[in-house]
From Swiss-Prot:
Any Pfam family hit: ATP-synt_DE_N
Protein name: ATP synthase epsilon chain, chloroplastic
Entry annotated with the keyword Manganese: no
NCBIfam families, alphabetized: ATP_synt_epsi
Organism domain of life: Eukaryota
PANTHER family referenced in this protein's UniProt entry, alphabetically: ATP SYNTHASE DELTA/EPSILON CHAIN (PTHR13822), ATP SYNTHASE EPSILON CHAIN, CHLOROPLASTIC (PTHR13822:SF10)
Subunit details: F-type ATPases have 2 components, CF(1) - the catalytic core - and CF(0) - the membrane proton channel. CF(1) has five subunits: alpha(3), beta(3), gamma(1), delta(1), epsilon(1). CF(0) has three main subunits: a, b and c.
Keywords: ATP synthesis, CF(1), Chloroplast, Hydrogen ion transport, Ion transport, Membrane, Plastid, Thylakoid, Transport
Gene Ontology MF terms in the entry: ATP binding; proton-transporting ATP synthase activity, rotational mechanism
Functional summary from the UniProt entry: Produces ATP from ADP in the presence of a proton gradient across the membrane.
Organism placement in taxonomy: Eukaryota, Rhodophyta, Bangiophyceae, Cyanidiales, Cyanidiaceae
The encoding gene: atpE
Matching InterPro entries: ATP_synth_F1_dsu/esu (IPR001469), ATP_synth_F1_dsu/esu_N (IPR020546), ATPsynth_dsu/esu_N (IPR036771)
């Protein structure tokens, strides 16, 4: 028996797999989930979800949301998600550099918040890419 993980965005099911273990980027830190985990509802932060399937870890970038764990079913509802195979490393590096530059230029509170969110997303994308190397 294993965990069934379903990642859902507002417009589609991004990922549905059976896994042995999952590590979620919760708002309070990394959260590991194994089979027969107690029922749980948790907020998710921008970050990399890692799923272990047959001794291979598969990363997926999550952009904030919620996860519900119940009866070996993990339902993840997020604003957006990206599979690593869809991320171009060169473009991700450029976006990270641009996000850092925008963070330094930000002056209003709104600009600072938006640039921080963009920076966190860019870092998560790079972290996911680097986890495969």
């Amino acid at each position: 028996m294993a965990l069934t993980v379903k990642v859902i965005t507002p417009d589609r099911v991004v990922w549905k797999k059976t896994v042995e273990e999952i590590i979620l980027p919760s708002s309070t830190g990394q959260l590991g989930i194994l089979m027969n985990h107690a029922p749980l509802l948790t907020a998710l932060d921008i970050g990399v979800m890692r799923a272990r399937m047959v001794n291979t870890w598969v990363p997926l970038v999550l952009l904030g949301g919620f996860a519900q764990i119940d009866n070996n079913l993990v339902t993840i509802i997020v604003s957006d998600a990206e599979e690593v195979k869809a991320i171009d490393e060169e473009e991700a590096n450029k976006l990270l550099a641009a996000s850092l530059a925008n963070m330094e230029k930000a002056q209003s509170n709104r600009e600072k918040i938006e640039s921080m969110q963009n920076l966190r997303r860019a870092r998560a994308r790079m972290q996911a890419i680097l986890s495969l190397k």
